[in-house]
Amino acid sequence: MMETMPNWLMQRAFLTPDRTAIEMEEEKVTFMQLHEKVVSVCEHLTHVGVKRGQKVAVLMKNGMEMITVIHALSYVGAVAVLLNTRLSREELLWQMDDAEVICLVTDQDFEAKDIPVYSFAEVMNGPKEEASIQEEFSLKEAMTIIYTSGTTGKPKGVILTYGNHWASAVGSSFNLGLRDDDCWLACMPMFHVGGLSLLMKNIMYGMRILLVPKYDADFIHKALQTRGVTIISVVSKMLTDLLERLGEETYPPSLRCMLLGGGPAPKPLLEACVEKRIPVYQTYGMTETSSQICTLSADYMLMKVGSAGKPLFQCQLRIEKDGVVVPPFAEGEIVVKGPNVTGGYFNREDATRETIQNGWLHTGDLGYLDEEGFLYVLDRRSDLIISGGENIYPAQIEEVLLSHPMVAEAGVVGMTDDKWGQVPAAFVVKSGEITEEEILHFCEEKLAKYKVPKKAWFLEELPRNASKKLLRRELRQLVEEM
């Protein structure tokens, strides 16, 4: 098994120098131009003291600057600690302290007492110094640290190596196939692994990326119609927004894949996509698996509604309960293994030991396999509602709520109940006139009695993170305040 590889972007710039690497609304950059920009950033970062093996925090929004910084850190051999721009100052300071970073590179106003903060513009306007550029990458070396959302307790820094990122891109290419004319529309934040993984695929495949700095449904919809996009990564909310804009039209046949992540998609949404001939590939993955680890191809979209598919070619997956592998249709914890799976968390030996056992990663997600080995993700274990001893999966109730024509968005969490321990409570964004009573009655017709929400509240919008995933922990806080 190989232990080193040529520096990815340098190799790509050597192989296909004039091919378009990144396209933005008004700008195009070839792989050679990207390499030259990265070398320049590298020399500026070297001047401010960034060296091989150090950890550097990156707090930036999607854009050419962020892309060049991420690559420049790999050129120097430093580890990029990617920070979520939507976090509070306290949360960011905590993560930087936890990751033991030597400095922060940012395009935002940010002050920190104990860590040097370098604005990207200042660094680039400052002096340069000859950089010691890594012409080879060791696949065992850490490339990035990304903090998990921390649905329970403090977030943990997931260490992803060059080997993890390489395996993820290879697995994805086996799964989706590669074409010379591929163009992946990138609108996911690059501080999330889903967005970051596109940067890796971009240079490894030699594939054009259409970069959208921030989520803009109108621009994305238009780009899918006119910019030759073949693949886009989405979550359910984005897919719903795009379908609304599509109306009676269809997207060009060149759009060959919508990669849907971020949790199970409601059935009515998938049915609408089939009607519009939109090829949706449902996926399952997490920071710890360097993006997707399971995918359901569009061939099975309706035959296996709600399934996240089968593992990527070099990955394995099983369902365990109390440490024992369970038969088909038995519910348990999803456990995965593969070369794209992290070796552990930074400075968290206990959490690493608890999560990774004999090379198998215990995801904390609940699911089951059908008789053909297709995975069905039920929910995060931490989101499970246990009511009078019965397991209730919020995703199932949300799917029912979303099938109502007057419901635009839905989120379900557990609410403390004296009799049952917990009961479901729903939060709804309306798309038309509907009352709480009508919503609860609608659920009564479609769900077992114990699964019917005890209460439904209306919100203008649901709390979501930067990649548009529903933040149930914030809904739980709202329940406590109600």
From Swiss-Prot:
Example of a GO biological process term: menaquinone biosynthetic process
Entry EC no(s): 6.2.1.26
Protein name listed in UniProt: 2-succinylbenzoate--CoA ligase
Transmembrane segments: none
A molecular function GO annotation: o-succinylbenzoate-CoA ligase activity
This protein's pathway: Quinol/quinone metabolism; 1,4-dihydroxy-2-naphthoate biosynthesis; 1,4-dihydroxy-2-naphthoate from chorismate: step 5/7; Quinol/quinone metabolism; menaquinone biosynthesis
Family: Belongs to the ATP-dependent AMP-binding enzyme family. MenE subfamily.
SUPFAM superfamilies in the cross-refs: Acetyl-CoA synthetase-like
InterPro entries cross-referenced by the UniProt entry: AMP-bd_C (IPR025110), AMP-bd_C_sf (IPR045851), AMP-binding_CS (IPR020845), AMP-dep_synth/lig_dom (IPR000873), ANL_N_sf (IPR042099), MenE (IPR010192)
Protein keywords: ATP-binding, Ligase, Menaquinone biosynthesis, Nucleotide-binding
Enzyme class: ligase
Classification of source organism: Bacteria, Bacillati, Bacillota, Bacilli, Bacillales
Catalysed reactions, as listed in the record: 2-succinylbenzoate + ATP + CoA = 2-succinylbenzoyl-CoA + AMP + diphosphate
Role: Converts 2-succinylbenzoate (OSB) to 2-succinylbenzoyl-CoA (OSB-CoA).
